[in-house]
Structures are given as structure tokens and as C-alpha cells.
């Protein structure tokens, strides 16, 4: 069984979530990030082989983080539902979406392991979720149909969430990039489209980290 999720561009969501937690980076948190990525396929297929060691180790680390930071319980309950759903959903398009949200796991867990509080996590996690939802909606339209007016309308809630929860400069940059990616989506290859979404994710995380480092968030 392949170790990495066969879900196309959703690994970029994992990368974004991991990079978003860079200021919390420790050996423990690096292990959390890697085990999160390596646990998706074993949980989906539940084959009785060595790969099950990854979700077992991830569960052990999650329990340890819960011991360190009781706030962890809220996130564990939410993400447990996502990881369990991977086992029971057989529709590929739905499976991909669930997998993408499950792979946002590193950021909150790395922050919690470092001792971050609930309010410190909620705003960036909401931004990450909103961008993930936008990307998934746009990708679904691009791959299985055509990008249409509904995809342009989806930019509105994305922009509002970013303007409310982040710095105006970051909100403007992400909104502008989202518009460009949406406009170009139908006219470029699927591969180029995937790189465009990766660029959008990296623009968000680099901008967020830079503004956070500068004390502007």
C-alpha cells in the first residue's frame, strides 16, 4: 500500500497547515506533521500491515498532547470524526474533500503541543479552513465540469473571512490571487491549475507568518 495519500493536490493542504505552524516547530511537532500525512491511507484502507503503526503512533502523540493541553479535546473530537469518515465513505469526490480537511490536522495539534490557547488557534485555523473549502470547490468544478459564476461568488465569503480575521494586506493579496486563479482555471492544464492552488496556499501562509512575525496580526 502506498504511504502517501493518492488525492492529488490535497497534500498541499497538509503542507500549508504544517508551514502555518512553523513558529511552533519542535521535534515533537515535526513528528505530528509527518504522522498526520502517513496516517490517512492506513485509516482509509485498514489493511493489517506495518502501515497501521502510523495512526497508532499519531493517537499516542495526540493523547500526550491532551495531557499537556486539555484544550486539545475539542480538536481531537472534530478531527476524529473526519478520520473515521475516511473509512466509511466510498465516493472518491467526497473522500478527497474529507481527506483535505483531515490534513489540516498538523497546525492545531502543533500549536496545542506548544501550549497555544484556543483563541490563538481559532483565527488562523478558520482562515485555513476557508481557503481549503474555496480550493476544493474550485478544483471540483475545474476537474469534473467547468468553472462558472458560482465559483466567482465563492470568492465573496473567502474575502470577507480574510478581511475580518486577518490583516487587510493579506486579505487583499489572497482575494486578488483567488480571482486570478478562478479566471485562469478553465484555460490552463490540470497540472498548472494544481500549481496555481499551491501558489495560493503558499501566498496565504507566507503572508500570514510574515505579518505575525512583524506583530501586525
From Swiss-Prot:
Organism of this sequence: Archaeoglobus fulgidus (strain ATCC 49558 / DSM 4304 / JCM 9628 / NBRC 100126 / VC-16)
Bilayer-spanning residue ranges: 13-35, 50-68, 75-94, 109-131, 152-174, 194-216
Record-given protein name: Uncharacterized protein AF_0172
Keywords, comma-separated and alphabetical: Cell membrane, Membrane, Transmembrane, Transmembrane helix
Subcellular location: Cell membrane
Membrane topology: Multi-pass membrane protein
One GO cellular component term: plasma membrane
Amino acid at each position: 500500500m502506498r504511504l502517501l495519500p493518492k488525492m492529488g493536490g490535497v497534500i498541499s493542504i497538509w503542507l500549508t497547515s504544517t508551514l502555518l505552524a512553523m513558529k511552533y516547530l519542535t521535534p515533537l511537532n515535526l513528528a505530528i506533521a509527518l504522522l498526520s500525512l502517513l496516517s490517512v491511507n492506513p485509516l482509509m484502507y485498514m489493511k493489517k500491515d506495518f502501515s497501521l503503526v502510523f495512526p497508532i503512533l499519531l493517537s499516542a502523540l495526540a493523547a500526550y498532547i491532551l495531557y499537556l493541553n486539555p484544550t486539545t479535546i475539542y480538536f481531537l473530537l472534530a478531527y476524529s470524526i473526519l478520520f473515521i469518515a475516511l473509512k466509511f465513505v466510498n465516493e472518491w469526490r467526497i473522500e478527497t474533500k474529507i481527506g483535505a480537511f483531515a490534513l489540516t490536522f498538523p497546525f492545531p495539534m502543533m500549536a496545542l503541543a506548544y501550549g497555544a490557547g484556543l483563541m490563538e488557534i481559532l483565527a488562523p485555523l478558520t482562515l485555513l479552513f476557508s481557503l481549503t473549502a474555496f480550493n476544493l470547490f474550485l478544483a471540483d468544478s475545474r476537474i469534473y465540469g467547468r468553472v462558472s459564476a458560482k465559483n466567482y461568488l465563492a470568492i465573496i465569503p473567502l474575502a470577507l473571512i480574510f478581511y475580518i480575521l486577518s490583516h487587510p494586506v493579506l486579505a487583499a493579496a489572497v482575494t486578488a490571487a483567488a480571482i486570478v486563479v478562478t479566471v485562469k482555471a478553465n484555460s490552463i492544464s490540470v497540472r498548472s491549475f494544481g500549481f496555481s492552488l499551491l501558489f495560493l496556499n503558499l501566498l496565504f501562509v507566507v503572508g500570514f507568518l510574515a505579518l505575525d512575525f512583524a506583530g501586525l496580526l
